[in-house]
Amino acid sequence: CALPISIFLSPDGKSYKANREIAVSGLKFEKSGEELPLEKVHTPGCKTIDEVAGFLGVKPENTGKAVFYSDEKGNLIFVLIRGDFEVNESKLQNHLGLLEINFANDEQIRKAGAVPGYASPVGIDPSKARIVIDKSVAGSSNLVVGANEADYHYKNFNYGRDLKDADVVDIATVRNGD
């Protein structure tokens, strides 16, 4: 059953409202500053965005969050989104042209060469997972992401240098004020 799509534009054209399945953020993501060298750092026991950010003294928006899904045929989908955002599964499904996606299990994640809790797009075999990057990641500089090794993360991940050829799309859930 499809959800009704609602879009409301203000008469002055300066604002709009839309349901979350289609809402587009007004935030602009532009890389700033010099791309620093990719650096592997020890992050013992830090698996969540809050744990990693706290341990390294960075804000969640300076991290990348890996989320894994599988499609109806069991194909793996690796999603990377900025750590302060959530994946909008409706947008992801629409982009992929899928009716259904489910969270992948740890075995599926490991088969692609990733480590649950420490997953990274760096080193993922693209033949084993479709990689989808949110525009928030593509437009950010020097993010902290997993290193595909327990208790380690990379600092200074930059899309375009450390990963290329992923689908870059808007798959973030729009928050109030975005």
Residue spans for each PLM region:
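Extended, low-hydrophobicity, polar/charged segments
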Residues: 2-178
